Amino acid sequence: MVLIRVLANLLILQLSYAQKSSELVVGGDECNINEHRSLVLVYSDGIQCGGTLINQEWMLTAAHCDGKKMKLQFGLHSKKVPNKDKQTRVPKEKFFCLSSKNNKEWDKDIMLIRLNRPVNNSKHIAPLSLPSKPPSQDTVCNIMGWGTISPTEETYPDVPHCANINILDHAVCRAIYPGLLEKSRVLCAGILEGGKDTCGGDSGGPLICNGEIQGLLSVGGDPCAQPHVPALYIKVFDYTEWIQSIITGNTAATCPP
C-alpha cells in the first residue's frame, strides 16, 4: 500500500495521493545537533511534516502538508529541551503548482512558503542551497526528520534521525507506483535491501545530496523501509526557476508542465 507520510496526533492522516501517509526516518541514527541547520519542523492542523529553509525568508515543504494553522520551527533538535536559538514563524504567503491542490499529479507536491518575518542565521539555523544540477543515479543522499523510527509502530523520537540512501533508477519506482509517468518530476530514492527509509511524520522533509536540497519527501511504502519499495521525492531541480522567480517578485510564475 502506498502512503503519504504524515503524522496527525496519534493517527496517520490519509490523503488522496493513492492513500499515502507521511513518514519518519527508519534505520537511521540521531542527527548531529549541528548538522541540520536548514531542517524545519512543520505543524499543520495537527499534522507533523518536515521542511527546508532555502533563505532567511523562504522555505520548501510538500503541498500535502498545507493547513489553515501552520507553525514552523527553526533551529530545533530536541522537542523537550529546545535549543536557545530556536525560532518560530508562520506563513505569510504560500505558493503551489496549479494542480497540486487537486492531489492528482505525482510530481506537483511542492509548496513554497514565505515566512511572516525572516529568521536569523545562528549556530543551529542556516539555509540550504538550491540544486545546481540534478543528482545522478547511485548518488548517496541524506534524509532526516522527526518521523517515526519504527516501520510498524508509531514510535516518534524527541530528536531528528538521519540516514543515507541512494538515488535509484526511475524505472524502479515506475514498477511500484501505478500511474507514475516516465518523465515525472520526481526522484526515486531508497535502499533496495530495505531497512532505511523515511516514514510517518517526515513528509515534505529534505533529500540532501552533496550539500544541496535535491528532493522533498512525497510518497512512500507502508510499512516503511520494505525491500524494493523506495520512496518518491519531488525533484527540486526542476522547480528552481519557478522558486527563484517567485522569490524575486514574480508571484505569477508558473510551474513547469
Curated annotation (Swiss-Prot):
Its EC number is 3.4.21.-. It is found in: Secreted. Residues 25-248 form the Peptidase S1 domain. GO terms for molecular function: serine-type endopeptidase activity; toxin activity. The keyword Signal applies. InterPro entries: Peptidase_S1_PA, Peptidase_S1_PA_chymotrypsin, Peptidase_S1A, Trypsin_dom, TRYPSIN_HIS, TRYPSIN_SER. Gene3D superfamilies: Trypsin-like serine proteases. The active site is at H64 (charge relay system), D109 (charge relay system), S203 (charge relay system). CDD domains: Tryp_SPc. Its main location: secreted. GO terms for cellular component: extracellular region; secretory granule. It comes from the Eukaryota. Residues 1-18 form the signal peptide. Pfam families: Trypsin (PF00089). GO terms for biological process: proteolysis. SUPFAM superfamilies: Trypsin-like serine proteases. Residues 19-24 form a propeptide. Belongs to the peptidase S1 family. Snake venom subfamily. Snake venom serine protease that may act in the hemostasis system of the prey. Monomer. This is Snake venom serine proteinase 11. It comes from Crotalus adamanteus (Eastern diamondback rattlesnake).
